[in-house]
């Protein structure tokens, strides 16, 4: 009796093992490669860019609301440290949110590194694209001198008062200036928006590229047109 019970248990266990093995090989069962990845495990550049960047910077790195990632001058003047800081921490007061997990975003440090490397590999331009360009960042600038820089280099498209001209829109619109940082303005002045017909720092007036001081001054002039933040109500 005891031996018969042992044989029965062994047979049941064997059958169970066969059934389990059979379930693993059922037609249509997803393979490991078919299983969805956790968001933090995604390492494909195209996927990361498409899900996190394309909405503002364009599906192909251009023609979005924000600066084009395929702009060779932009990629030449911004270093990896600065790009990582912008992606990780965002730009307070603008539409650029933080993407790093410690800052409230969803991306790991590794994923941010993949984005930086992928942007450079996918859209790298000529090595000398930014040769002679003013530095990516700078403080200061004189808005009074910037008035003259604007008149000589910008008003032909944006109008004498910056409110728009025959070929381009306003650069002093309160809503626009409230949504962009001084660094963004500086980047546009230096790198341009070629997909929109906006020249870079050396292409507006032939043979007369803007100096670093002139870039800082015209940015200061633009920033002076930004409305002051509204005061909070006391009651």
What are the residue ranges of the model-derived segments?
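Bacterial N-terminal signal peptides that target proteins for export
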Residues: 2-13
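C-terminal motif of bacterial Sec signal peptides marking the signal peptidase cleavage site
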Residues: 19-22
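Electrostatic cytochrome c docking/interface patches
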Residues: 24-47, 121-149, 232-235
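Gly/Gly-Pro-rich "capping" loops immediately C-terminal to redox-active cysteine motifs
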Residues: 35, 39-42, 46, 58-88, ...
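Short, solvent-exposed loop/helix junctions and linker helices
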Residues: 39-43, 47-50, 77, 105-109, ...
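The canonical Cys-X-X-Cys-His
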Residues: 45, 49-59, 115, 146-160, ...
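Axial heme c-ligation environment in periplasmic c-type cytochrome domains
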Residues: 64-72, 89-122, 129-140, 165-170, ...
């Amino acid at each position: 009796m005891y031996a018969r019970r042992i044989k029965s248990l062994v047979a049941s266990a064997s059958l169970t093992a066969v059934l389990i093995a059979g379930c693993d090989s059922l037609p249509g069962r997803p393979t490991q490669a078919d299983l969805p990845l956790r968001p933090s495990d995604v390492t494909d550049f195209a996927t990361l860019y498409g899900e996190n960047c394309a909405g503002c910077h364009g599906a192909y790195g251009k023609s979005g609301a924000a600066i084009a990632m395929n702009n060779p001058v932009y990629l030449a003047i911004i270093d990896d440290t600065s790009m990582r800081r912008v992606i990780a921490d965002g730009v307070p007061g603008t539409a650029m949110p933080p993407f790093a997990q410690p800052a409230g975003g969803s991306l790991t440090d590794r994923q941010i590194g993949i984005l930086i490397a992928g942007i450079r590999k996918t859209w790298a331009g000529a090595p000398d694209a930014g040769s002679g360009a003013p530095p990516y960042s700078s403080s200061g600038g004189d808005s009074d001198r910037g008035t003259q820089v604007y008149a000589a280099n910008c008003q032909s498209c944006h109008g004498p008062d910056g409110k728009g001209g025959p070929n381009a829109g306003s650069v002093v619109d309160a809503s626009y200036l409230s949504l962009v940082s001084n660094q963004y303005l500086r980047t546009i002045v230096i790198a341009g928006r070629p997909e929109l017909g906006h020249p870079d720092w050396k292409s507006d007036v032939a043979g007369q590229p803007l100096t670093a001081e002139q870039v800082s001054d015209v940015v200061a002039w633009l920033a002076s047109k930004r409305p002051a933040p509204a005061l909070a109500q006391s009651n």
